[in-house]
Each structure stands twice: as structure tokens, then as C-alpha cells.
């Protein structure tokens, strides 16, 4: 199945052997990246069905608010027994897509927070176009060294690109 969009990754990137350490807890996340990497990657929130809270549309655009409540009912709770609510707000207008995300901790323990989007692009964009006609340029500001398991080495000598 093809999936296109801008999924929100809660706990993005990789955790070596699935271990997530915070200032007040250590969580053993499931390893979902096979050998030779053996990491937990990208969390779980992007795979959850969100509830539509409100929406509206008119000639100027549209907006949508969704929410996801993470608690004991989520299968991932066995690995990270915390409670939170994730709220999403999307506005589509002539200016493009505006996206806001908030997360509210509802647990006595500290909630680890790391969020990213994972851009996917369906190309070519129009019928009859060819992939080789598309050029995507993304500026690189910093380059980080990864080890053989695709984990950052923490090398302070990361290249500064100009």
C-alpha cells in the first residue's frame, strides 16, 4: 500500500536496542528495525487513528482539528506507561497548508518529547511528466556522522556546510 502525506512522528529517529532514557525513567521500546540495525524507529503516533474534534470549510479554505488520547488502551502503553493527549490543527488556504501540533502530558512522570514529520512526495506531479524532469533541492546546514547501525555517533566534529 502506498502512503503519501506528512505523518507526525512522535519519538522520531532511532533508539539503540529500543532503549529510551529520560531524567526519571528508562523505557524499553520494541525493536522494529531488523538486523543489522536492531533499533526502535519512528515511534507509533503516526499509525494511530485520530478523532476529528471539529472542522469547517468555506470559499477561503478549510480547517480541521483532530486529537489522539494515549493511555492504557493503546498497545504501545506496555512499553511507555505514560498518558498524554496529542492535538493536531490543519488550515488549508491560498497561502498553503498550516500545521500545528501540541502534546499535553497527563502523567506524574516527565513525558519525553521529540517530534518530526516524515515528508513523502508522490512524483511525477502531473500526468505525462517524467521523474527525471523533477529536481528537488534541499539545503544541508549540518552533517552528522552515523555509525553502522545508523545512529548518530555524537561526534562534536560534525561538518558545518556552507
PLM ranges: what are they?
Residues 19, 26, 96-98, 110:
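Structural motif
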Residues 90, 97-105:
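Short, well-ordered beta-strand segments enriched in hydrophobic/aromatic residues
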Residues 110-111, 120-162:
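Active-site/ligand-binding surface loops and adjacent short beta/alpha elements
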Residues 32-94:
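Extended, loop-rich substrate-binding clefts of extracytoplasmic carbohydrate-active enzymes
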Residues 85-87, 104, 109:
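A domain-level signal for the structural core that forms small-molecule/cofactor-binding pockets
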Residues 1-33:
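Acidic-aromatic substrate-binding/catalytic surfaces of carbohydrate-active enzymes
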Residues 71-73, 95, 106-108, 124:
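Short coil/turn motifs at secondary-structure junctions
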